[in-house]
Amino acid sequence: MTDKLAVNRNTFDQVILPVYAPAQFIPVKGKGSRVWDQQGTEYIDFAGGIAVTALGHCHPALVSALHQQGETLWHTSNVFTNEPALRLAQKLIAATFADRVFFANSGAEANEAAFKLARHYAIERHSPYKTKIIAFHNAFHGRTLFTVSVGGQPKYSDGFGPKPADIIHVPFNDLAAVKAVMDDHTCAVVLEPIQGEGGITSATPEFLQGVRALCDQHNALLVFDEVQSGMGRSGKLFSYMHYGVTPDILTTAKALGGGFPISAMLTTEEIASVMTVGTHGTTYGGNPLACAVAEAALDVINTPEVLNGIEQRHGLFVQALQSINSKYDVFSDIRGMGLLIGAELTAKYRGQAREFLAAAAANGLMILNAGPDVLRLAPSLVIELEDIQQGMARLEKAMASVIKG
């Protein structure tokens, strides 16, 4: 047995590439919506690993699936297929518009596959010049050079040399702006139905319906990035289901594995038909371990018991945020859908989101930010109502400590 080296938060600063600024405590154990650090301090988790642990920490169904598959078969590569991947694909197809699935390991990989597919389809079916991608300011689609370029945030994409060409960014929820740049050279419009990193901003129904119509008019594909908004987060299995607008390609990750790395790209038979052996691939994508856990997660999440409880929990969070705001006048807007909630700070506290995060941690609560001005809550979809009540009391105490100095 390998001896475990003693590590602490200082170790991070010595050995990890300095691209993160993690909290000063190290979580070591989680159960449900509770987490404990190295010192045994307990936290209530409203962060969900950035909308990943949709069933909380160490959910029994996921632990059982991982344990059972871990004793059976770990990895084969895609030289062979495997039963968990085929079962998971069947269930995703049955639950959505899709006919075909591609599995990968992260949201960025799923989006990379989606963008490549969109261009390849346009070139094969229409024209070698049909390569324009229309995307949106403040979007986030991943960290590969292609996905970070499609994401509309220069702070993430600048500084790495030439970017992939023919990507246009316009304001989100602005149909006229899309129409102004849309033409027959457009291969795809790419968007998040709920912008996550961009501040928890939901698309309007009119916007999505209008974009769908423009895509149909110009033979362009509509790509929905549901990496963060999917798998029940919005109150439906995927957020497109709220709008009556069906994409041509959809990506999902984060909560798909409930904490185990896996992602998927979903599309139709017609679009998938342009791909042949070798046009895309991955070594780990669709591995038996990940797919077994994801199948268990999907089986639990895609039930009335879970999905019907999300709106009640949403209401409790919003009510508590409104109560805090009535006392401290700290939020200019409280928004979001289901259990992806954003609270935008007023001008007085603009830029202080991370200060509020630190105060929350000091009071035994894990929350997120979505940019410098928005507090983000993305808890377990099955979080206990008592945990919501206690956690929001801790948040109020944390907010007061910052506001009162």
Curated annotation (Swiss-Prot):
Subcellular location: Cytoplasm
Molecular function in Gene Ontology: identical protein binding; N2-acetyl-L-ornithine:2-oxoglutarate 5-aminotransferase activity; pyridoxal phosphate binding; succinyldiaminopimelate transaminase activity
InterPro entries: Ac/SucOrn_transaminase_bac (IPR017652), AcOrn/SuccOrn_fam (IPR004636), Aminotrans_3 (IPR005814), Aminotrans_3_PPA_site (IPR049704), Class-III_PLP-dep_AT (IPR050103), PyrdxlP-dep_Trfase (IPR015424), PyrdxlP-dep_Trfase_major (IPR015421), PyrdxlP-dep_Trfase_small (IPR015422)
Major localization listed first in the record, in broad terms: cytoplasm
Keyword entries, A-Z: Amino-acid biosynthesis, Aminotransferase, Arginine biosynthesis, Cytoplasm, Lysine biosynthesis, Pyridoxal phosphate, Transferase
Modified residues (N6-(pyridoxal phosphate)lysine): K254
Function: Involved in both the arginine and lysine biosynthetic pathways.
Family, as annotated: Belongs to the class-III pyridoxal-phosphate-dependent aminotransferase family. ArgD subfamily.
PANTHER family referenced in this protein's UniProt entry, alphabetically: ACETYLORNITHINE_SUCCINYLDIAMINOPIMELATE AMINOTRANSFERASE, AMINOTRANSFERASE CLASS III
Full protein name: Acetylornithine/succinyldiaminopimelate aminotransferase
High-level lineage: Bacteria, Pseudomonadati, Pseudomonadota, Gammaproteobacteria, Enterobacterales
